[in-house]
Each structure stands twice: as structure tokens, then as C-alpha cells.
Amino acid sequence: VLSPADKSNVKGVFAKIGGQAEEYGADALERMFATYPQTKTYFPHFDLGKGSAQVKGHGKKVAAALVEAVNNIDDLAGALSKLSDLHAQKLRVDPVNFKLLGQCFLVVVATGNPALLTPEVHAPLDKFLCAVGTVLTAKYR
């Protein structure tokens, strides 16, 4: 459960990276594909090379979903309901992949803004990304 301080820290991170969120989303995907090659199986029709327009496009969607979640941090389930349905019912993405992408997103934030990711910010951001993953996998049952 995210505390009020956690929510404030998460909102602060996204306020600082807002203009770069799409780039961060694409970078996180690239890192996930490189580090966890099994995740590529969900994108057989994509050019997965570095700087690929398709990866950038999907990174934009990832960023938009995270921004939507931040903007509705008190109702993550409501904000991400359609996305949860899509991933559970149609795409059937392995739930572990959300955790992997979240970890890659943390790495991107850390490398892009090392001073931003203090322990006081890292823990709430990790909790938030885990909460997003939990919501996205809630409809798998």
C-alpha cells in the first residue's frame, strides 16, 4: 500500500521526468529485451533493434500508462482496467514480465537521473511499479 508520502514521491519523480517519459519507456523496453530475451516472444512482428520506431512507439504507450497511473494513483485499478483486460484476455502476457519491465524502468530512472533516485524515492517508486504490475495481472484469474 502506498502511503501519502510514497504517492508524493512518485508524483515528484514523474514531474521531473515528464518530458522524457516516452524516451524512458522505450529505453526500459530495450533493456528488458536485452536482459530478458524471452520477453521478445510477445513482439514477433516488431523490429526490436536499438532505436526501432516500433519499440519507441510501444515505449510511448508504456509511458502513457504509467503517467495515467500516476495521475490516478488513488484508483490504479480503475485507471488501468482496460489495459489489464487487454493484457490478460487478449495478449496473454506472462505476468512476470510486468515486474521485469518495472525493474528496467527503475534502472532507466537511476541512470538518467542518479541524484533523483535516493533511497527515499527508490522504495516508493518500486512499490508503485509493483502495484501497477499487480493491477495489470489482477484479471488473469
UniProtKB/Swiss-Prot annotation:
Gene3D superfamilies referenced in this protein's UniProt entry, alphabetically: Globins
GO cellular component assignments: blood microparticle; haptoglobin-hemoglobin complex; hemoglobin complex
Molecular function via GO: haptoglobin binding; heme binding; iron ion binding; organic acid binding; oxygen binding; oxygen carrier activity; peroxidase activity
Globin domain span: 1-141
Residue sites binding heme b per the record: 87
InterPro entries documented for this protein: Globin, Globin-like_sf, Globin/Proto, Hemoglobin_a-typ, Hemoglobin_oxygen_transport, Hemoglobin_pi
Transmembrane stretches, start-end: none
Tissue expression summary: Red blood cells.
Pfam families linked to this entry: Globin
Binding, O2: 58
Keyword annotations from UniProtKB, A to Z: Heme, Iron, Metal-binding, Oxygen transport, Transport
Keyword Transport: yes
GO biological processes: hydrogen peroxide catabolic process
Subunit structure: Heterotetramer of two alpha chains and two beta chains.
Function: Involved in oxygen transport from the lung to the various peripheral tissues.
UniProt family annotation: Belongs to the globin family.
Stated name of the protein: Hemoglobin subunit alpha-A
